[in-house]
């Protein structure tokens, strides 16, 4: 048997880790994908890129539905809230989704709603993995509000409630002993310390997969620390009960490099997408696979159509989104996203599809149509700069990331601003376009584009904020379970 595990931290195949395990059964005709084996291909495969160390993978799971969640009570750091029967079922479903994923260590908040979730997740495994209960995963300390319902809190402390909703990083509360403190500031210190300790035990140069089970606020803070603490990031994220977020960490030129593989996936639950609020929603999809994706060729603005697997991915996305009410649809004017959008819309007859050049892929100029090995022959230093500091690179006769950022974000804002609050729009575009849009929404910068994974056929959901003074919410990012497995198994090719 031949098994291939491939990880990529960017669009390029130079940053790919390849692991081959051989047995005496001979070599099957298999094609390699992002984290496993799929499809038929020839026996011989070449890798025109250096092999690098496996990254550290973090599986971040929020606890299942609790008694206080149902009652809409503030839980914070108290341990009065218990896991409900629904929460127990959610934990088991999470465990089943992760059953085939090797996990080297598990850490959990000691609060019973999280500890019970961890027990449920691990109960379906056969490896006897025991969790470590770590105070570094305790939930945010909201002592003065503990046990209050959301309505009671708004009545008793309207000023504090407004600050919590609009500027949570600035919230100050008073403990029973009279001391003043800032809950989010304290929690960020806690998150930094937890991650520092975790990475000392599980270095990014290793190959560990670590399960971390915690609470809404502490997990948000962990994510913000991983992303470099973008300004106003706390309200840009959504984490549902029993959701899974996957982060890959690898050695970088400055410390470690982070990649969001997926965020707030509840595809193992029903319904498979977070509930829509009262404002507009946008469903962002990357186009299906092309032959050039598979080969690792830089496509850019060369109009390569979907291959057979790309059409199958579009069909899988159609099935995954079938129950979603779509009111409008937008696509890049290029063939591969347009074909993907048309495939998804087969379940949404009558929904008009608008194509726009604003969502076109980055122009790679003279790099288009070339493999990385070919690009390296003529632009070795520029290609390395593209990997290390993409915001500094002017593509030869092509675009910069800033160029793509400006036109894609402007196009996105035009689409979002044109939606009625009740509407949901489908938007299908490309890797670089989606990355720049999502970096913008997460409060990141053009230099951070490698932090966002966008698999072929992957689904991302963005919700417009209830409060117009607040940023849009990334409700989930790069869902690919409809393409097979809880981890992203899409091709690790170039743009």
Language model feature labels by segment:
Residues 46-55, 92-162, 315-384:
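Phosphate-coordination/substrate-recognition cap region in phosphate-metabolizing enzymes
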Residues 65-116, 120-121, 177-191, 291-344, ...:
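Loop-to-helix element that buttresses phosphate recognition and phosphoryl-transfer chemistry
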């Amino acid at each position: 048997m031949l098994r291939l595990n491939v990880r990529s931290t960017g669009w390029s195949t130079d940053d790919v880790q390849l692991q081959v395990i051989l047995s005496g059964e001979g070599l099957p005709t298999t094609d390699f994908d992002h984290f496993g084996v799929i499809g038929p291909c020839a026996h011989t495969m070449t890798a025109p890129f250096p092999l690098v160390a496996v990254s550290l993978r973090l599986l971040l799971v929020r606890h299942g539905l609790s008694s206080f969640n149902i009652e809409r009570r503030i839980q914070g750091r108290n341990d009065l809230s218990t896991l409900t029967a629904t929460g127990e079922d959610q934990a088991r479903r999470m465990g089943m989704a992760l059953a085939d994923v090797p996990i080297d260590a598990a850490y959990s908040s000691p609060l019973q709603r999280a500890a019970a979730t961890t027990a449920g997740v691990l109960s379906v495994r056969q490896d006897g993995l025991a969790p470590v209960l770590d105070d570094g995963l305790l939930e945010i300390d909201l002592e003065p509000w503990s046990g209050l319902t959301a309505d009671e809190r708004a009545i008793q402390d309207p000023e504090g409630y407004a600050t919590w909703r609009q500027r949570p990083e600035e919230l100050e509360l008073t403990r029973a002993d009279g001391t003043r403190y800032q809950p989010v500031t304290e929690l960020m210190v806690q998150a930094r310390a937890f991650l520092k300790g975790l990475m000392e035990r599980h270095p990014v140069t290793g190959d560990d997969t670590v399960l971390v089970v915690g609470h809404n606020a502490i997990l948000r803070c962990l994510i913000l620390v991983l992303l470099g603490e973008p300004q106003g990031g706390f309200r840009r994220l959504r984490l549902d009960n029993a959701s899974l977020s996957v982060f890959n960490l690898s050695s970088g030129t400055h410390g470690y490099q982070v990649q969001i593989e997926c965020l707030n996936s509840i595809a193992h639950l029903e319904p498979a997408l977070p509930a829509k609020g009262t404002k507009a929603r946008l469903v962002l999809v990357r186009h299906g696979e092309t032959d050039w994706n598979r080969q690792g060729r830089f496509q850019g603005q060369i109009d390569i159509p979907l291959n057979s697997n790309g059409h199958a991915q579009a069909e899988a996305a159609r099935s995954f989104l079938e129950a979603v009410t779509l009111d409008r649809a937008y696509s890049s004017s290029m063939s591969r996203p347009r074909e993907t959008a048309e495939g998804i819309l087969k379940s949404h007859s009558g929904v008009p599809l608008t194509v726009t050049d604003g969502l076109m892929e980055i122009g790679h100029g003279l790099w288009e149509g070339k493999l990385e090995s070919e690009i390296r022959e003529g632009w070795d230093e520029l290609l390395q700069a593209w990997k290390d500091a993409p915001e500094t690179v002017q593509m030869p006769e092509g675009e910069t990331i800033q160029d793509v950022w400006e036109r894609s974000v402007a196009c996105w804002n035009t689409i979002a601003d044109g939606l009625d609050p009740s509407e949901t729009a489908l938007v299908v575009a490309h890797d670089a376009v989606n990355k720049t849009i999502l970096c913008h929404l997460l409060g990141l910068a053009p230099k951070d584009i490698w932090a966002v994974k966008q698999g072929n056929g992957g689904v991302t959901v963005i919700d417009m904020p209830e409060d117009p003074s607040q940023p849009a919410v990334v409700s989930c990012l790069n869902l690919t379970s409809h393409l097979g497995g809880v981890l992203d198994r899409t091709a690790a090719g170039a743009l």
